[in-house]
Amino acid sequence: MLVVIACVCAALSALLGLAPYLVGGAIALGICVFIICFVSTEASLYVLIFSMLLSPEFGMGALAGPSSTTGGRGVTIRTEDMLLVIMCFAWLTRMAVHKELGLVRQTPLNQPIAWYTLACVLATGMGLIFGHVEGMTGIFFVLKYIEYFVIFFLVSNNIHSRDQIRRFTIAMLVTTFIVSIVAMVQIPMGGRVSAPFEGDQGEPNTLGGYLLFTGAVAGGLLLSLKERRVRGLLRGLLMLSIVPFLATLSRGSYLGLPIVYISLIVLKRGNRFPMIATLIVLIALGTAAMPQTVKDRILYTF
């Protein structure tokens, strides 16, 4: 343990010598986040929610590849990735202090997550053996997949009431609103819009997937809640987010949209006719009013 601490101190000293202000500020911020996570895991989850797509990203040197996008098979690290690592260490430290806390709460998804993770590890390992996958790039991609499961376990282990769920959901929808506004500002510049603070080569698919996921949550709430004011806010958020969603020109996100809508129809209790009628109207209006760039993206591969 002393050897590990000595190596970490030596590495930090070397980094401070290269970029004292930048690295020093990052270390100080990391220590603050660690303290927040240790004292209150709920507060750290709010930090994580708001950092989603509202934090800068950076390439991992050679891992950034020819392009900073996933399509270029490069690996990019966002600030929330680093926050998640710090949160995990704080979580483990907190569990060591409070021995009554369990490592992972039992949920119906635990076993499927374990099998999926095993499949990712085995597939990447075979790719490394046969030379189809670059070593560090493949490892970092698998780690970023596992990161989502870590978030799931962090949240599930720290949910204790419906009020917490409500507060986390509100924070997520507020983040979606901010992300949508920032993305809409990019539309007049031309090209595909991407998440904020991603530099010259953003990841439109990431933004499209994020808006699709949060839109599904907002749509589900719209169908289940009765308060008029809340329903009006949810409708406004959905109408706002659809504009940058289309501007991402993400085919994968487009393919997911009808699946989400059909799922909402199936899950809706009571009369489903209004949703089916709305779907028909949206298809008719979308065919006529959809921007040509979106039509070309759907109809043509190149």
Which residues make up each language-model segment?
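Alpha-helical transmembrane segments of multi-pass inner-membrane proteins
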Residues: M1-L16, G30-V33, C88, I113-M126, ...
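Outer-membrane beta-barrel domain signature
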Residues: P20-L22, V142, T206
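Hydrophobic alpha-helical transmembrane segments
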Residues: V23, I27-L29, V85, F89
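N-terminal hydrophobic segments of proteins, predominantly signal-anchor/transmembrane helices
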Residues: I35-F141, I146
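Aromatic-rich transmembrane-lumenal/periplasmic boundary elements in polytopic membrane proteins
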Residues: E147, Q292-F302
